[in-house]
C-alpha cells in the first residue's frame, strides 16, 4: 500500500533540478497510496560513488521541504547536468515500523549505501532473513521488513566477489535475492556498483514501466521485437517505473504492465525482461532465467483526469463527476432499437461466458470495503433476474475460512484498483477450485483483470481520492447491467428489464439533479460538526447505501458511524437511541417503504434526532409522527435507487470533513490501493 517510482534518463542532458522535480511529482501522483513518510535517492556527481539519500516522516511536501533545506545547507548544485542518471522514490503507508526517517524508503544495505531498495508489499519471512543476516555481521537500523532486501543484496554481492571468477551482474544479484523472499512485493533496486542501471521486479504487487523516446514522436504502435526491446543504442530515452499509471501519464503513454515473477533490467538505453521458470519466481543459484517477449500498450488516460481542475479536493471533483462517469460506464453497452424495438445490454467481455454463468449453481460476489457494498447493493436484482442464488463474501474472510467454492460456481471479484491483496488471494483460491472467475475493475491491465477468465471494465475514469465515490456508483451500474445480461433470455422479465434500461439511460440526469443538494448537505454537516457518532438505517436495496454512507463518514470525517440493517433495529441498536444521537434513515419508495415508515415512528417514539432521506413529495408523510429533517431525492427504479441515495451521503461526508478540518483526500491511516494484507 505504498507508492514506488523511478526515473532513468539515457543520453539525455537533464539538470539535477529537473530530476528532483520528476521524482517529487511522481510521488505526488502516488501520494494517495500512502503519505506518512517518503524518500528519494539520486546520483552523486560521480555515479560510481555513494548516492544521495533523503528520507523524511510526513507527506511529500515535508520531504520536498527537507530536501530543499539540505540543498541550501550543503550547496548542492541543482544546475549540474547528467547525461545518464538513475533515481528512485517512495511514499509510504506504514505496515512495519512507525512513520520515521529510519523506517522510510529507500532502505539501505548499510554504510556506503551499496544497495538501495524501494518496496511496495510485505515480506512475510523477513524475521528469518534478518536473523540470518545478523549472524553474518549485519546490523539493522529500521523496524521495516524491507531492510532485509538491500542487506541481502549486499550479502549476495560480497559473497559472489569473494568466490572470485566472473563478476556478478546486477540481475544475478537480484535473482538470488528473490529466491529467498516470501510474500508480496514490487521492488526497484539501485546500486552504485552498477551505475546508470536499475532493476525492477514484482510478485503480487503492481508495477508498470513507461518509455519515452526523446528523438521520436510518441508512437502508439511500437512493439518490442524481442526480450531486449528498445535494444542498446544511442537514442536519448527516459524510463519510468511506477506503482500505477497516474504517475506516468504526464510523461508518456507507452507502458508495459510488469507481470508476476518478471525482472526488468534498465541498462545502456535498453530494456530486458527476464522471468523465472520455477514456481513463485524461484531459481537455483546465480542463474539467468529465460527472456520474455513483451509489447508496449497505450495508456488510455489524460493528464486532466488526474488534476483537481476547478475543485478544491479530488473527492469533491469525483462526486460531481458522477453524471459523466456513469455515462461513460454505460456508453456502447445499452442498445435500444432493432427490428423489434427491443432494449438490450451488451457486455463484450462477458458475451462468450453468459451461458456458463446462467448454468451456475450460485454466483459468489467477493470484494472489500466499498466494492463489497456495491455488490451488496446489486444482489437483489441479480437474484431477481437470474434466478440464481447470490452469496456475498468479504475477501479476507473467505480466504481465512477457506470457504467452499465449487466448479459449478461463478465467482465475481469486484475491486476499483484491481490490485486489492485480499481479493487477489481469494481469486487465486477460486481459480484453484475450478470456478469461473469474473473481474469487475476500474483499471485495465490490473492483476484481477489479467487473472480472471472474463470481466467488465467500469470505465469510471481515474479516481484519486482515497474515499471511493464515482467508482462505487459505476460498479453498481455495471452489476445491474450484468443482471440484465444474465436474465436476457427470460421472456417473463422483459418488461422489467426494459424499464431498468430506460432508468439507466436517465440515471446521469437524475444524479445531476441530486447534486443540487450540495448546499443543503453542507448546512446539515454544519449541524453535525461536533457530533461523535452517527447511525444510518437502511433496508432492502438501501442496506448497502447505509453501510456505504456510514463508511464514507467514518473514512474521511473520522466520526464513528455505523450502517445498520433496519430489520435488526430491535435486536440491539434501538438501545443506543436517545435525544442526542443523530440518526439517518433511508426511506425512499420501494418494497420496503412501509417498513421504513414503521422504523421512523419507533425512532420518533424514543425521541431520536432523525434525518430522513425520502422520495420527492414524501417529506410530509415521513415526518408525520414527529419532527425530522427530510432530504428529498428523485425516485428511480428500485435497483438504481442506491446510486441516487448515496450521493447526498457522499456530499455530507465531504462537507463534514472540510468543516472538521481534516484532510479529505488523505484520511488518517488509510491509503487508496490496499495491496497488502
Curated annotation (Swiss-Prot):
Disruption phenotype: Male gametophytic sterility. Impaired growth and pollen germination associated with reduced glucosamine (GlcN) content, and lower tolerance to tunicamycin (Tm). Mutant plants exhibit also reactive oxygen species (ROS) production, cell death and a decrease in protein N-glycosylation. Abnormal pollen grains due to defects in a polar deposition of pectin and callose in the pollen cell wall. These phenotypes are suppressed by GlcN supplementation. Its EC number is 2.6.1.16. It holds the Pfam family GATase_6. GO terms for molecular function: carbohydrate derivative binding; glutamine-fructose-6-phosphate transaminase (isomerizing) activity. Highly expressed in flowers specifically in mature anthers, mature pollen grains and pollen tubes. Barely observed in roots, leaves and stems. CDD domains: GFAT, SIS_GlmS_GlmD_1, SIS_GlmS_GlmD_2. The active site is at 2 (nucleophile). Residues 2-269 form the Glutamine amidotransferase type-2 domain. It comes from the Eukaryota. Keywords: Aminotransferase, Carbohydrate metabolism, Glutamine amidotransferase, Repeat, Transferase. It is an enzyme of class 2 (transferase). It catalyses: D-fructose 6-phosphate + L-glutamine = D-glucosamine 6-phosphate + L-glutamate. Residues 353-492, 524-667 form the SIS domain. GO terms for biological process: glutamine metabolic process; pollen wall assembly; protein N-linked glycosylation; response to dithiothreitol; response to endoplasmic reticulum stress; UDP-N-acetylglucosamine biosynthetic process; UDP-N-acetylglucosamine metabolic process. Substrate binds at residues 370-371, 415-417, 420, 571. Induction: Accumulates in response to tunicamycin (Tm, inhibitor of proteins N-glycosylation in endoplasmic reticulum) and dithiothreitol (DTT, reducing agent that blocks disulfide-bond formation of cytosolic and ER proteins). Pathway: Nucleotide-sugar biosynthesis; UDP-N-acetyl-alpha-D-glucosamine biosynthesis; alpha-D-glucosamine 6-phosphate from D-fructose 6-phosphate: step 1/1. Controls the flux of glucose into the hexosamine biosynthetic pathway (HBP) leading to glucosamine (GlcN) content homeostasis. Involved in regulating the availability of precursors for N- and O-linked glycosylation of proteins. Required during pollen maturation and pollen tube formation by triggering polar deposition of pectin and callose in the pollen cell wall. Promotes tolerance to tunicamycin (Tm), an inhibitor of proteins N-glycosylation in endoplasmic reticulum (ER). Homotetramer, may also exist as homodimers. This is Glutamine--fructose-6-phosphate aminotransferase [isomerizing] 1. It comes from Arabidopsis thaliana (Mouse-ear cress). The gene is GFAT1.
Amino acid at each position: 500500500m505504498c507508492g514506488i517510482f523511478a526515473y532513468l534518463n539515457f543520453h539525455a542532458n537533464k539538470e539535477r533540478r529537473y530530476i528532483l522535480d520528476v521524482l517529487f511529482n511522481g510521488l505526488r501522483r502516488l501520494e494517495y497510496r500512502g503519505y506518512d513518510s517518503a524518500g528519494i535517492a539520486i546520483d552523486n556527481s560521480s555515479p560510481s560513488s555513494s548516492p544521495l539519500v533523503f528520507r523524511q516522516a510526513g507527506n511529500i511536501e515535508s520531504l520536498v521541504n527537507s530536501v530543499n533545506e539540505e540543498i541550501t545547507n550543503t550547496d548542492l548544485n541543482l544546475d549540474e547536468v547528467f547525461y545518464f542518471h538513475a533515481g528512485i522514490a517512495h511514499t509510504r503507508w506504514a505496515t512495519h515500523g512507525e512513520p520515521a526517517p529510519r523506517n522510510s524508503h529507500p532502505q539501505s544495505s548499510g554504510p556506503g549505501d551499496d544497495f538501495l531498495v524501494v518496496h511496495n508489499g510485505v515480506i512475510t519471512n523477513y524475521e528469518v532473513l534478518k536473523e540470518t543476516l545478523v549472524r553474518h555481521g549485519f546490523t539493522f537500523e529500521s523496524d521495516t521488513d524491507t531492510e532485509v532486501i538491500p542487506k541481502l543484496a549486499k550479502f549476495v554481492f560480497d559473497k559472489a566477489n569473494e568466490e572470485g571468477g566472473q563478476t556478478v551482474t546486477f540481475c544475478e544479484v537480484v535473482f538470488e535475492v528473490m529466491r529467498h523472499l516470501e510474500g508480496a512485493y514490487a521492488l526497484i533496486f539501485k546500486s552504485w556498483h552498477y551505475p546508470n542501471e536499475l532493476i525492477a521486479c514484482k510478485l503480487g504487487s503492481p508495477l508498470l514501466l513507461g518509455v519515452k523516446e526523446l528523438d521520436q514522436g510518441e508512437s502508439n504502435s511500437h512493439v518490442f521485437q524481442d526480450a531486449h526491446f528498445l535494444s542498446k543504442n544511442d537514442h536519448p530515452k527516459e524510463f519510468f517505473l511506477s506503482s500505477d499509471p497516474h504517475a506516468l501519464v504526464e510523461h508518456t503513454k507507452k507502458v508495459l504492465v510488469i507481470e508476476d515473477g518478471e525482472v526488468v533490467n534498465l541498462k545502456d538505453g535498453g530494456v530486458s525482461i527476464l522471468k523465472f521458470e520455477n514456481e513463485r519466481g524461484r531459481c537455483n543459484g546465480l542463474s539467468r532465467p529465460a527472456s520474455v517477449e513483451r509489447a508496449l500498450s497505450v495508456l488510455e488516460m489524460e493528464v486532466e483526469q488526474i488534476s483537481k481542475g476547478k475543485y478544491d479536493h479530488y473527492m469533491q471533483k469525483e462526486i460531481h463527476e458522477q453524471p459523466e462517469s456513469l455515462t461513460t460506464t454505460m456508453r456502447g453497452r445499452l442498445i435500444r432499437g432493432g427490428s423489434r424495438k427491443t432494449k438490450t445490454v451488451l457486455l463484450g467481455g462477458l458475451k462468450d461466458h453468459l451461458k456458463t454463468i446462467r448454468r451456475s449453481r450460485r454466483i459468489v460476489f467477493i470484494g472489500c470495503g466499498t466494492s463489497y457494498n456495491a455488490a451488496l447493493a446489486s444482489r437483489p436484482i441479480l437474484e431477481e433476474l437470474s434466478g440464481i442464488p447470490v452469496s456475498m463474501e468479504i475477501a479476507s474472510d473467505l480466504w481465512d475460512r477457506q470457504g467452499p467454492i465449487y466448479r459449478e460456481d461463478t465467482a465475481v471479484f469486484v475491486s476499483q484498483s484491481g490490485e486489492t491483496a485480499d481479493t487477489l488471494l481469494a481469486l487465486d483460491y477460486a481459480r484453484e477450485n475450478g470456478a469461473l472467475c469474473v473481474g469487475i475493475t476500474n483499471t485495465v491491465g490490473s492483476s484481477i483483470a489479467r487473472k480472471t477468465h472474463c470481466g467488465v471494465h467500469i470505465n469510471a475514469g481515474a479516481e484519486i481520492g482515497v474515499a471511493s465515490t464515482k467508482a462505487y456508483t459505476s460498479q453498481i451500474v455495471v452489476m445491474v447491467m450484468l443482471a440484465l445480461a444474465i436474465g436476457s433470455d427470460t421472456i417473463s422479465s422483459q418488461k422489467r428489464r426494459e424499464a431498468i434500461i430506460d432508468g439507466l439511460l436517465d440515471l446521469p440526469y437524475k444524479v445531476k439533479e441530486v447534486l443540487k443538494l450540495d448546499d443543503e448537505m453542507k448546512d446539515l454537516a454544519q449541524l453535525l460538526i461536533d457530533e461523535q457518532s452517527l447511525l444510518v438505517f437502511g433496508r432492502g436495496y438501501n442496506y448497502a447505501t447505509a453501510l456505504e454512507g456510514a463508511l464514507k463518514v467514518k473514512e474521511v470525517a473520522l466520526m464513528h458511524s455505523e450502517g445498520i440493517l433496519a430489520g435488526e433495529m430491535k435486536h440491539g441498536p434501538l438501545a443506543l437511541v436517545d435525544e442526542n444521537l443523530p440518526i439517518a434513515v433511508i426511506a425512499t419508495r420501494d418494497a420496503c417503504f412501509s417498513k421504513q415508515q414503521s422504523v421512523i415512528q419507533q425512532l420518533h417514539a424514543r425521541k431520536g434526532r432523525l434525518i430522513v432521506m425520502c422520495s420527492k413529495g414524501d417529506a410530509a408523510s415521513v415526518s408525520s409522527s414527529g419532527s425530522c429533517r427530510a432530504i428529498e431525492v428523485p425516485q428511480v427504479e428500485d435497483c438504481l435507487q442506491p446510486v441516487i441515495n448515496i450521493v447526498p451521503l457522499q456530499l455530507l461526508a465531504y462537507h463534514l470533513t472540510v468543516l472538521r478540518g481534516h484532510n479529505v483526500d488523505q484520511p488518517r491511516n488509510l491509503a487508496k490501493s490496499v495491496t497488502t494484507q
